[in-house]
């Protein structure tokens, strides 16, 4: 029995990045031998075991053979005669097909070290094309390591295009697509994930609402980058700088979906694109089974982001009504989330990357003023039933009006 550290732990250590999870491959052993040594078997489809002390995963070396469609259509073979090189060959990228023995020596049968040095994401073998999930995984790795200047090898991107055009992505379940997307949204450069999907044709298949934005112009005065698709990726990049939250980043990604519905004869204007985009947000989220909390914020951002941009022009009643509409009294975090997504929208434009966004500050200040109005005082004043809400709203409007007169200019 020989044990090797494999995959991401080896890769990230060589890149000087923190190692989160360690996976091991066991060569020359059997399930019974692992059980006798105190390991706990957890793998149903192939032999994976948990170490009795560390609880890290130890998998018997195995090979895979395509036996059906999609990313689950594989038959696994695990036996003592499967070599380390056999096991590494089934992996997606050369940089993930690295192993380390107990002496610290790196085993690199597929030039993963060279590709690490050259910052290349390259597939190990043509078997890459048998698993459509790998298209999303490579896009995610491209986003994860974009800050290290990694790029996808030309032949790998070409294979991803072939897989997309062959309809392989249609075998992916909504849950897996969302899971990869959610993971990509946590990276430092999530916009790269969607750019890669567009480069290989997968964006049109998996995210048609976003793909439809490319080639749709916006007024050059407000959008020097012109193209709404480019603007969308720029705003996502900015959102990633402003917030680590997946819901903020996803909502920013979806904020302009309504512009894809504007008839070409009305370009570059997009009046009413916010409310129009709400239906597309719902459509996308229902298809991918996006969690409700993330979906709800994306709907609100699509509907109200333009309203935030005009904040100095809003009357106090409209401001308080906005807080009602986003359910801020029960979910106060939405005020901050709306401020961040709106700021990402403004700064996600060519030449505006460092722009100030006072509307975000005013939104936060107005919220602090509105929520500081005490409900207890209204009750103690003798109001009852529905009168309490009505009087509370009146007092909130008055408080915001007083604040606005002192702190918020009438135009910007």
UniProtKB/Swiss-Prot annotation:
Keywords per UniProt: ATP-binding, Hydrolase, Magnesium, Metal-binding, Multifunctional enzyme, Nickel, Nucleotide-binding, Nucleotidyltransferase, RNA repair, RNA-binding, Transferase, tRNA processing
Note: A single active site specifically recognizes both ATP and CTP and is responsible for their addition.
Family affiliation: Belongs to the tRNA nucleotidyltransferase/poly(A) polymerase family. Bacterial CCA-adding enzyme type 1 subfamily.
Assembly with partners or alone: Monomer. Can also form homodimers and oligomers.
Pfam family of the protein (one): PolyA_pol
Top-level taxonomic group: Bacteria
Listed HAMAP family: CCA_bact_type1, CCA_bact_type2
Domain HD: 228-329
Reported cofactor(s): Mg(2+); Ni(2+)
Enzyme Commission identifier(s): 2.7.7.72, 3.1.3.-, 3.1.4.-
Originating species: Escherichia coli O81 (strain ED1a)
Binding site for ATP: 8, 11, 91, 137, 140
Name of this protein: Multifunctional CCA protein
Reaction(s) this enzyme catalyzes, per UniProt: a tRNA precursor + 2 CTP + ATP = a tRNA with a 3' CCA end + 3 diphosphate; a tRNA with a 3' CCA end + 2 CTP + ATP = a tRNA with a 3' CCACCA end + 3 diphosphate
Gene designation per UniProt: cca
Cofactor binding note of this UniProt entry: Magnesium is required for nucleotidyltransferase activity.
Binding site for CTP: 8, 11, 91, 137, 140
Keyword Nucleotidyltransferase carried by entry: yes
SUPFAM superfamilies: Nucleotidyltransferase, Poly A polymerase C-terminal region-like
InterPro entries, A to Z: CCA_bact (IPR012006), HD/PDEase_dom (IPR003607), HD_domain (IPR006674), NT_sf (IPR043519), PolA_pol_head_dom (IPR002646), PolyA_RNA-bd (IPR032828), tRNA_CCA-adding_enzyme (IPR050124)
Positions annotated to bind Mg(2+): 21, 23
Domain writeup: Comprises two domains: an N-terminal domain containing the nucleotidyltransferase activity and a C-terminal HD domain associated with both phosphodiesterase and phosphatase activities.
MF terms in GO: ATP binding; CCA tRNA nucleotidyltransferase activity; cyclic-nucleotide phosphodiesterase activity; magnesium ion binding; phosphatase activity; tRNA binding
Role this protein plays: Catalyzes the addition and repair of the essential 3'-terminal CCA sequence in tRNAs without using a nucleic acid template. Adds these three nucleotides in the order of C, C, and A to the tRNA nucleotide-73, using CTP and ATP as substrates and producing inorganic pyrophosphate. tRNA 3'-terminal CCA addition is required both for tRNA processing and repair. Also involved in tRNA surveillance by mediating tandem CCA addition to generate a CCACCA at the 3' terminus of unstable tRNAs. While stable tRNAs receive only 3'-terminal CCA, unstable tRNAs are marked with CCACCA and rapidly degraded.
